[in-house]
Amino acid sequence: ASWGVTGNQSLNDDSALGLGISAYYPYTDMYTIRNVNDEASFVFNRKGNKDLTWEKTQNVNVGVEFDIAGIVEGEVDYFNRLTSDMLFLRSTALSQGYASIPVNDGKMRNAGVEFSLTAHAVKTKDVSLDIRLNGSHYKNSIVELPMDGESGNRMDFYQYTSRFTWVKGGSIYDFYIPTYKGVDPETGYALYKTLNAVDAAGNVLQENVTDVELYKKNHKSEQYSLVEGTPTSDWTKAASDFVGKSATPKLTGGFGFDLRVKDFSLSTTFTYSLGGYAYDYVYA
């Protein structure tokens, strides 16, 4: 068993920083040299944060090793990693002269099991054959979302990309997209799920709710239900919501064998990934 704390100081959100390189100095204001009216000029690039600290990860590991008659040996480990003071780019009002500032905020947990097995299938003077197998299963969950720079409260959700949205208790790799409902037999276009907000009497409050988490945030004090409407081929009217699919595989690992015949040896290694979903941008 072991316990420890590791740090991370890398803030590498290139798209948000607009630098095209890693943010090596997130604690200080940065400027770039540009041509302005044919004159070399220093131009403000991004805002730093002098109070920024290391991102911290607490690691807990518990494992067991075993050997069965020298034929099968292996190891099983349980790990639990809680990351706090996460490095995050908090959006700010553009009137301040910059769009975001790096801060320490949010918590995330990764917990799971890793194993490795080796079977000594053949073991003689001239021939030996070892078969190897290892794997890992883990669950990623968001413990605490960052603060909202405008309201001063914890975020209800955070849209990480156009396909992934973060909520407390969910994974950073949970798909948040419109639900596919088949093909329109008349046009051949793909159909997607729509949602309408209705009150207790069945009156429609809003047709075509396109972002479920955003609607929940903006209508917390209201009583309503989201009712499925007629499928649409218009992507702009489709309802984006969690579809119960994750990009995280259920099990990943590798396998292979080591063969020796006198002075000749052969080793192979293969990798595998079971479960998890991928989004096809070409056919979507």
Language-model features: locations:
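Flexible glycine/proline-enriched surface loops and loop-helix/loop-strand junctions
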Residues: 44-45, 238, 249-250
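Conserved C-terminal beta-signal and adjacent last beta-strands/turns
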Residues: 128-130, 246-274
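Conserved small-residue
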Residues: 13-16, 20, 103, 122-245
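Extracellular/periplasmic, surface-exposed regions of secreted and cell-surface proteins
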Residues: 1-167
